[in-house]
C-alpha cells in the first residue's frame, strides 16, 4: 500500500518494470566524498537502487553493509543477478523496513527526477531522515533545471498540466522532473549541507544535462 503522499505518478511502476532494466544510468559515484564521511563498515542504503550499479561500486571499494531498495521487481531481479553478494529488497511503499536511526548513509541517485510531485519527494526524504542516525550522510545525485531550448520547451508545455515548472512527459510514457536549487534547499531542510558539486552527466536517454551532487548530514530534532 502506498503512502498517501506518494502516488502512482511518483512510482510509475509499469514503466520501470519494462524499460528500467534496459536504461543506462551514468551519474558517477564520488568515492572520495563517501569515504570522508562513511567508514567501510557503515550501513548504507540505496533508495531506488535500480539494477544496483552504485552499490556494486561501493562493494568493490570495500563497503560490505549495503542494502538496495526499489519498487520495481524487475530492477531488483536484475540487481540480484548482477551483485548476488549485496542485499536487495523490493519495497511496496515509501516506508523503509528498518528501525529509526539505524543507517549511516543513504544514496538517492537519479530518483528525484523520477518522482514528479513535491509530496512524493518529501515522503522519500522524510523517510530517509527517519532511518539515518544523527550525523548520517544523505547523498543525492540528480538534475538541475536545464537552459537549452529543448528542455525549456518541455517545461513550458507541461507546467500547467502538472503545476510545477520543470515537470514534463517523455515520449515513451514516463513523467520526470528537473529541479530548482531553491526546491532542493527546502526539501533537505532537516539536513546540514556539507558539500555541493555540479557536473555534466548523460541522461538515461543519452542526452547531456547539468546535474548536482548534494551531500548533507542528518539533523535530529529534539523530541
Label the predicted regions:
Residues 1-42, 47-95, 139-223:
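Class I (Rossmann-like) S-adenosyl-L-methionine-dependent methyltransferase catalytic domain
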Residues 28-31, 121-125:
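Short amphipathic alpha-helical segment that frequently serves as the phosphate-/nucleotide-binding helix
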Residues 97-99:
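GHKL-family ATP-binding catalytic core of two-component histidine kinases
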Residues 110-114:
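Short catalytic micro-motifs in class I SAM-dependent methyltransferases
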Residues 122-134:
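A short glycine-rich, Lys/Arg-flanked "PGG" loop and its adjoining helix->strand segment in the class I
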Residues 107:
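A conserved beta-strand element that flanks and buttresses the S-adenosyl-L-methionine
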Amino acid at each position: 500500500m502506498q503512502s498517501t503522499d506518494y502516488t502512482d505518478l511518483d512510482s510509475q511502476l509499469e514503466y520501470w518494470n519494462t524499460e528500467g532494466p534496459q536504461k543506462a544510468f551514468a551519474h558517477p559515484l564520488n568515492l572520495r566524498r563517501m569515504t570522508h564521511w562513511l567508514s567501510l563498515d557503515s550501513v548504507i542504503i540505496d533508495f531506488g537502487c535500480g539494477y544496483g550499479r552504485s552499490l556494486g561500486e561501493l562493494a568493490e571499494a570495500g563497503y560490505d553493509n549495503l542494502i538496495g531498495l526499489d519498487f520495481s521487481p524487475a530492477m531488483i531481479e536484475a540487481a540480484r543477478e548482477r551483485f548476488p553478494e549485496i542485499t536487495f529488497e523490493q519495497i511496496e511503499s515509501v516506508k523503509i523496513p528498518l528501525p529509526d536511526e539505524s543507517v549511516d548513509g543513504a544514496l538517492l541517485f537519479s530518483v528525484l527526477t523520477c518522482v514528479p510531485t513535491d509530496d512524493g519527494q518529501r515522503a522519500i526524504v522524510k523517510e530517509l531522515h527517519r532511518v539515518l542516525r544523527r550525523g548520517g550522510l544523505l547523498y543525492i545525485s540528480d538534475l538541475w533545471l536545464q537552459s537549452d531550448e529543448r528542455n525549456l520547451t518541455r517545461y513550458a508545455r507541461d507546467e500547467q498540466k502538472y503545476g510545477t515548472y520543470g515537470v514534463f512527459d517523455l515520449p515513451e510514457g514516463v513523467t520526470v522532473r528537473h529541479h530548482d536549487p531553491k526546491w532542493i534547499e527546502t526539501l533537505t531542510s532537516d539536513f546540514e549541507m556539507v558539500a555541493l558539486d555540479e557536473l555534466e552527466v548523460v541522461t538515461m536517454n543519452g542526452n547531456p544535462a547539468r546535474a548536482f551532487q548534494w551531500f548533507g548530514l542528518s539533523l535530529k530534532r529534539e523530541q
